[in-house]
Amino acid sequence: MEEQEIITTLKILIIGESGVGKSSLLLRFTEDTFDPEQAATIGVDFKVKTLTVEGNKTKLAIWDTAGQERFRTLTPSYYRGAQGVILVYDVSSKQSFNKLDAWLNELETFSTKHDMVKMLVGNKIDRANHEVTKDEGLKFARKHHMLFIEASAKTNDGVQCAFEELVEKIIQTPGLWETSSKNLTLSNHGPEGQGQSCYCVL
């Protein structure tokens, strides 16, 4: 059987406060592992993964950035050319949720693609002490025209779905990416039926 052609390479960013689990989400998605002692990212981490969504094989270049202020000088080059962004907060930390507006402002300032697809992820739903409700996350996502999902890098709940939904929406956005492939497949159905935790709120 012939190897399926990769139709495009997409640049995906993961942003949010330090400690919300950005690196853990990336590690779970790319390597299906979880390290409870995951150290804070210094600067930028970068991983590549191939993903097939709706019959389209894409290569994802996923950038994970440090949430700390002292690394913010990396910002302009980090955002340049990105087609998708995953904005992460910790459902057990109201403070991380309250900082989302600042991250969105930075995204608007530095992103070079105005139609970039945004996904809001409420991480660490395995924890008992939730400070942010699902409704609060959904309301914020709707207000800012973002996809939304709650997830847990620890249990792997919602992680695959988050990346698949993001990539599917990018593929369905004309002009956001380029392809030389003739194998593009477009579908017009939404994310219904892919599990209770996934919401498309655009």
Curated annotation (Swiss-Prot):
A motif (Effector region) lies at residues 38-46. InterPro entries: P-loop_NTPase, Rab, Sigma_54_int_dom_ATP-bd_1, Small_GTP-bd, Small_GTPase. Pfam families: Ras (PF00071). It catalyses: GTP + H2O = GDP + phosphate + H(+). Its EC number is 3.6.5.2. SUPFAM superfamilies: P-loop containing nucleoside triphosphate hydrolases. It is a lipid-anchor. Its main location: membrane. GTP binds at S18, G21, K22, S23, S24, D35, P36, T41, G67, K124, D126, A153. The small GTPases Rab are key regulators of intracellular membrane trafficking, from the formation of transport vesicles to their fusion with membranes. Rabs cycle between an inactive GDP-bound form and an active GTP-bound form that is able to recruit to membranes different sets of downstream effectors directly responsible for vesicle formation, movement, tethering and fusion. Belongs to the small GTPase superfamily. Rab family. This is Ras-related protein Rab-18. The lineage of its organism: Eukaryota, Metazoa, Spiralia, Lophotrochozoa, Mollusca.
